[in-house]
């Protein structure tokens, strides 16, 4: 089934070229199907890239999905045009009365700041509190996961001695959990972050279960016992070239950065990187949409 997106969204052409089934709202409204309503709080600086990456994964589900893009009203991004934001995004006061079947809170390049110093932290906490009553299941990604663990459970983040940067092996810690249904015992996922959460802090919280770990990247996937809050410290949505672009960006800025681990063939940045995480990324999103959103959400919200 398709993903429903605004008619002129730039991601539409890219997704169609990749044979991802998309349709605009006009065609979707003509189908007598109850679609899932997913809201994406996009905190990434390059919003159009993040849109395409997330829509690509949502579009591989057999379910019909309506997507709403949300941005903080208290933050003015520097790398996305005002026209794009006005055309395709809404702000929290305009949707706080609505119910959504699922929500995605993306990462953001603010992880080295204390949470309370992020200029939209107050608004973000208001949104995360709202999800308790208005969203069936929320998927938090990278810094979004750290922010959610801190807000909901008081779990802090810790600075790393060097950036966790590369594509790492992960193991399934809990068998027969629906979110990881169909996963291999070992799977790969990109990470790109300067901070971490600790296993021992999470294990102190009875409502949380660690579903996946990495020897090198640490905690990867955490879920609340009711499945309403999912925390993912990696970036399964990343394109094959995203880490390459981040590496070249940091080199150009003169920042201390090492070659992304287990990413370039033979650790040679002149070689094109291979996407070795795509199948599990798609499976993760399909499982979340099916078992944690579609199977749990009411047909009609009260």
UniProtKB/Swiss-Prot annotation:
Pathway: Amino-acid biosynthesis; L-methionine biosynthesis via de novo pathway; O-acetyl-L-homoserine from L-homoserine: step 1/1
UniProt keyword annotation of ATP-binding present: no
Highest rank taxon of the organism: Bacteria
Lipoprotein as UniProt keyword: no
Active site per database record: 142 (acyl-thioester intermediate), 235 (proton acceptor), 237
Site, Important for acyl-CoA specificity: residue positions: 111
Biological processes annotated in GO: L-methionine biosynthetic process from homoserine via O-succinyl-L-homoserine and cystathionine
Residues that, per the record, bind substrate: 163, 192, 249
Keyword annotations from UniProtKB, A to Z: Acyltransferase, Amino-acid biosynthesis, Cytoplasm, Methionine biosynthesis, Transferase
GO cellular component: cytoplasm
Marked site (Important for substrate specificity) residue numbers: 192
Reaction it catalyzes: L-homoserine + acetyl-CoA = O-acetyl-L-homoserine + CoA
Locations listed in the record: Cytoplasm
Major place of residence: cytoplasm
EC number(s) stated in the UniProt entry for this protein: 2.3.1.31
GO MF annotations, alphabetized: homoserine O-acetyltransferase activity; homoserine O-succinyltransferase activity
Pfam families per UniProt: HTS (PF04204)
Record function comment: Transfers an acetyl group from acetyl-CoA to L-homoserine, forming acetyl-L-homoserine.
Similarity remark: Belongs to the MetA family.
The protein's name: Homoserine O-acetyltransferase
Organism: Geobacillus kaustophilus (strain HTA426)
């Amino acid at each position: 089934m398709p993903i429903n997106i605004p008619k002129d969204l730039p991601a539409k052409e890219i997704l169609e070229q990749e044979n991802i089934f998309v349709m605009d709202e006009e065609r979707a409204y003509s189908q007598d199907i109850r679609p899932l309503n997913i809201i994406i709080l996009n905190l990434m600086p390059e919003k159009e890239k993040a849109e395409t990456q997330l829509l690509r994964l949502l579009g591989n589900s057999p379910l019909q999905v309506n997507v709403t893009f949300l941005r903080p009203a208290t933050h003015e991004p520097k790398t996305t045009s005002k026209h794009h934001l006005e055309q395709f995004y809404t702000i929290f006061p305009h949707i706080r009365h609505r119910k959504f079947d699922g929500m995605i809170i993306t990462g953001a390049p603010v992880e080295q700041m204390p949470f309370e110093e992020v200029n939209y932290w107050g608004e973000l906490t208001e949104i995360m509190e709202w999800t308790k009553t208005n969203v069936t299941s929320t998927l938090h990604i990278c810094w979004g996961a750290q922010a959610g663990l801190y807000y909901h459970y008081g779990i802090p983040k810790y600075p790393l001695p060097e950036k966790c940067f590369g594509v790492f092996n992960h193991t399934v810690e809990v068998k027969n959990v629906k979110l990881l249904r169909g996963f291999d015992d070992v799977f790969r996922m990109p990470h790109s972050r300067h901070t971490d959460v600790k296993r021992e802090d999470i294990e102190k919280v009875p409502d949380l279960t660690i579903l996946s770990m990495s020897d090198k990247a640490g905690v990867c996937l955490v879920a609340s016992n009711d499945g309403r809050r999912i925390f993912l410290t990696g970036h399964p949505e990343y394109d094959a070239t995203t880490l390459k672009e981040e590496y070249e960006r940091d080199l150009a800025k003169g920042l201390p950065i090492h070659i992304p681990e287990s990413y370039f063939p033979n650790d040679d940045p002149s070689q094109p990187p291979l996407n070795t995480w795509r199948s599990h990324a798609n499976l993760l999103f399909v499982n979340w949409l099916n078992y944690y959103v579609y199977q749990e959400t009411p047909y009609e919200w009260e």
